[in-house]
Design a protein with these regions (language model features):
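Residue-level signal for the short linker/turn that defines the boundary of a DNA-recognition helix
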Residues: 1, 27-30
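Short basic helix-loop element that most often maps to the first helix and adjoining turn
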Residues: 1-9
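Recognition helix of helix-turn-helix/homeodomain-like DNA-binding domains
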Residues: 10-26, 34-36
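An N-terminal domain-cap segment
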Residues: 19, 60-75, 80-82
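Short amphipathic alpha-helical surface patches that mediate protein-protein
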Residues: 22, 50-54, 96, 167
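Short amphipathic recognition helices of helix-turn-helix/homeodomain-type DNA-binding modules
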Residues: 30-33, 37-69
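Hydrophobic protein-protein interaction segments
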Residues: 68, 77-86, 91-92, 98-250
Length: 250
């Protein structure tokens, strides 16, 4: 992006942007926020930019269990419960499990205890040889998808923890790092194909974030929802609900 494009998009003069970039002018706190908003800089990094410019952080970072976050917890619970009988989870910026609905234990059945005890990292749980990996039918395809997504997230954020996680997961068996297997003919998305109690279940997933977040914690939460990719998967999960086979998530 050129200085002119940035200036036009942020509603400031190109001359002022040039002076800020070269250090000839000290930006105001409002200017820092304005430029960061136009560049879609994450809230955590906006706070870091403000501190570097000599200003106080503008965005709070509350724990999810604080009273002010009550409406957020309620919204998350409504989404998770409303998605049943299909699985849904909430993760933080490092893919740590924040919450899950009652369908999730069906997917992680058989995983080693050390992977399902808090703190749980859902990517590690998915790809670890003692986790879900042995039951993932298309492990190479799913592994390549997750590593690509994690790698892009690490590059964009510059987060060392994400780079370290990527390095760890890439060392697990299950496919050649950096090589994405060919998708099935006519595929519309990378599916998760998982063996569960003798059935092969197939899912496609979506990621949902809070689009109007002004709190760092809230801005970094994502709801990962899994939808049945075929009629059999939907029926198996509906039967699990009817039989009261779904149990509270860990």
């Amino acid at each position: 992006m050129s200085q002119l494009d940035l200036a036009l998009g942020a509603g400031v003069s190109a001359r002022h942007v040039s002076f800020v970039e070269t250090g000839r002018s000290r930006p105001s706190a409002e200017m820092v926020v304005q430029l960061a908003e136009h560049l879609d800089v994450p809230l955590r990094d906006r706070n870091a930019l403000l501190l570097a410019a000599g200003y106080a952080p503008a965005y709070a970072q509350r724990d999810l269990d604080e009273p002010d976050m009550g409406p957020v917890r309620d919204a998350i619970d409504r989404v998770l419960r409303g998605h049943e009988p299909f699985p849904a989870i909430v993760v933080d910026r490092h893919w740590g499990l924040v919450s899950a609905n009652r369908a999730v234990p069906l997917l992680i059945k058989g995983a080693a205890a050390h992977l399902t005890e808090p703190p749980v990292n859902v990517l590690r749980l998915s790809l670890h040889p003692e986790g879900m990996a042995p039951r993932i039918v298309n492990l190479g395809e799913w592994r390549a998808h997750l590593l690509d997504r994690l790698g892009r997230q690490a590059v964009v954020s510059g987060d060392r923890a994400l780079f370290a996680l990527h390095e760890e997961l890439a060392a697990y068996p299950g496919g050649e790092p950096g090589h994405a297997p060919d998708l099935e003919a006519g595929a519309i998305a990378v599916p998760l194909r998982l063996r569960v109690d003798g059935d092969e279940l197939a899912f496609i997933s979506t990621a949902t974030t809070f689009g109007t977040a002004t709190d760092v914690t809230l801005s970094e939460l994502a709801i990962e929802s899994f939808f049945p990719a075929d009629a059999q998967t939907a029926e198996v999960l509906r039967r699990a609900v009817a039989a009261d086979a779904l149990t509270p998530a860990p």
